[in-house]
């Protein structure tokens, strides 16, 4: 078994490198003019190198409980290697992921399987950021890889992270020609068959494509808070009864004893405040400064609709996994308007740099307090 780093050092090294990258780009942005932030191309080499290093080091991580569900995935993988599990069939849930695991188990050790998953998790993000804004792709990728959910869903919620990365890449194709739309549909199909809960952001993408009214999106998001406070339990049970994702349903209806093993339950005002920040930036960009484009509307709509669903079931166990169905878009929704539009009237580069620094600082703080 390959051991690049002891398990307990992974997060430390990750944050050391992220700190260096954040300070590097902070200085670059802070010294840039408004036009320089939006128009000057930034070399992608540094961030691509970090992404490749992340794939290698994290993909070949040791099997340790420090990485959450990595241990459970490895256990299933070993059972497949020992012939203790039947081959997956198309009728099984999440067939693509199970088939990939089954075929990998025949020919390679578990670490190489995780390496492949890590490629599928990170590479779509690299491509999506480049397709979305080639001049500022490294900044978008840094925002994405410094989000506080990024590391966890590369080592813990593997299916969720992999599926959402494919949905994010699919978003960059939806506005293209007929072939691009087929690519978008194919990526969404793969995502759904990797993790069925990705149906939520996929549905949000389709809804936003046909209905792009920002004011209505805000009303819907605010209404979801009242629905959660007044009838959160009933709404959770309703979604669980739909049964489109057995794992999602089990998270919703998990009893208190089981919930103690997972995330804290109850209405998460801290999560809600965190989720609100892109909405505040969007309000300032769309309504105050009248700055928007089709890509930003699609990003914002997907984020708002997906996040509103999570708010309605926010009291459920394992609420963080529901949240990720919108949070994977969080860093890009936050960064995109500052990189594409002259959002700030004064000191645009400095304010954009401060948002980047605050974004990373929040992730670092969450790690320090053990979230």
What do the predicted segments below correspond to?
Residues 66, 71-75, 204-320, 368:
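Alpha-helical transmembrane segments and terminal signal-anchor/GPI-anchor hydrophobic tails
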Residues 154-161:
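Short acidic/glycine- and proline-prone juxtamembrane loop motifs at membrane-interface regions
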Residues 167-182:
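Membrane-interface transmembrane helices that cradle and orient dolichyl/undecaprenyl
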Residues 129-147:
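Transmembrane-helix signature of polytopic, membrane-embedded enzymes
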Residues 185, 197-208:
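Transmembrane-embedded, aromatic-rich helix segments that form part
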Residues 222, 342-365:
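Signature aromatic-anchored transmembrane alpha helix within multi-pass, membrane-resident enzymes
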Residues 71-82, 86-109:
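Short hydrophobic/aromatic helix or loop-helix immediately within or flanking a transmembrane segment
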Residues 116-133:
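Transmembrane-helix motifs of polytopic, lipid-linked glycan transferases
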């Amino acid at each position: 078994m390959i051991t690049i780093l002891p398990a307990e050092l992974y997060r430390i090294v990750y944050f050391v490198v992220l700190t260096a990258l954040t300070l590097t780009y902070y200085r670059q942005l802070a010294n840039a003019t408004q036009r320089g932030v939006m128009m000057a191309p930034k070399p992608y080499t540094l961030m691509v190198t970090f992404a490749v290093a992340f794939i290698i080091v994290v993909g070949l991580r040791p099997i340790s409980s420090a990485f959450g569900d990595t241990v459970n995935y490895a256990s299933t993988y070993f059972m497949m290697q020992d012939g203790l599990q039947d081959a997956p069939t198309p009728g099984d849930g999440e067939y693509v992921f199970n088939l990939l695991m089954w075929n990998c188990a025949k020919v390679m050790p578990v670490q190489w399987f995780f390496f492949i998953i890590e490629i599928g998790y990170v590479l779509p993000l690299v491509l999506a950021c480049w397709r979305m804004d080639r001049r500022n792709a490294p900044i978008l990728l840094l925002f994405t890889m410094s989000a506080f959910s990024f590391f966890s869903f590369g080592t813990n919620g593997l299916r969720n992270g992999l599926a959402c990365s494919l949905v994010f890449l699919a978003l960059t194709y939806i506005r293209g020609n007929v072939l691009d739309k087929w690519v978008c549909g194919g990526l969404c199909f793969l995502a759904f068959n990797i993790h069925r809960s990705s149906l939520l952001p996929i549905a949000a993408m389709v809804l936003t494509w046909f209905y792009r009214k920002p004011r209505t999106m805000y009303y819907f998001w605010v209404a979801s808070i009242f629905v959660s406070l007044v009838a959160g339990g009933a709404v959770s049970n309703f979604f669980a009864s739909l049964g489109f994702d057995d794992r999602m349903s089990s998270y919703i209806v998990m009893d208190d004893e089981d919930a103690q093993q997972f995330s804290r339950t109850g209405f998460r005002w801290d999560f809600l405040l965190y989720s609100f920040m892109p909405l505040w930036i969007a309000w300032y960009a769309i309504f105050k400064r009248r700055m928007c484009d089709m890509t930003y509307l699609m990003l914002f709509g997907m984020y708002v609709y997906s996040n509103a669903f999570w708010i309605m079931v926010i009291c459920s166990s394992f609420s963080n996994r529901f949240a990720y169905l919108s949070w994977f878009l969080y860093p890009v929704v936050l960064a995109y308007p500052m990189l594409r539009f002259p959002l700030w009237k004064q000191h645009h580069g400095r304010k954009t740099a401060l948002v980047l620094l605050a974004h990373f600082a929040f992730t670092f703080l969450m790690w320090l307090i053990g979230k």
